[in-house]
C-alpha cells in the first residue's frame, strides 16, 4: 500500500483503489457521480436540494470542505479507480473532536455499479487507518439502517462493533430512520507527543 498522506490531505493507494481528499477541481466529477447514482442512493441519504447535484453546488461545498480539512475539523474523501480516474464512492469524517474525546463520525457512499467488489471495505480500512495514525483519533463512530445489510457487512469487515440501537436517529429520504450504532476503537492510541 502506498501512502502519501499529510495532516491536511489523504492520499492512499491500495492496488488500483485510490483514497484521496476531495479538491476544488473535483466538482464536475462529484456532481456527475451523484447525478448518476441519484436514484440508487436516495433510500440511504437525506433529501437533497438540486444544488447538491450541480457542479456549482459542489464548487461551493468543496470550498467549505477544504476549509474544514485545513482546520482539522472534517475530511471528505473520494474513492477513485487509479488507472481510469473513475470515481467509485465517498468517505467523509465529520464531528471531529479532539481532547478529551478524540473521536469522529464516518459516513460513506458507493456507486451502484461498484457494489460487491470490496471497494468500500478496502477504502474504509484505509480511511480509518488515516484517522487513527495521522489524525491520532481514538474512536470512529458509524450508524446504519437495520435493513442495510451491505453497510452492516462493510462495517463488520473493517472491525466496527455494535454498540446500540437509536430510534428515529436520522432523517433519511424525508423519513426518520432507526440506526444501529457502531464504533471502531484505535487499540494503539497514544496521547499526542508520545
Sequence positions of predicted segments:
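Acyl-donor (CoA/ACP) binding surface of acyl/acetyltransferases
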Residues: 1-29, 33-43, 76-194
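Conserved GNAT-fold acetyl-CoA-binding loop/helix
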Residues: 42-63
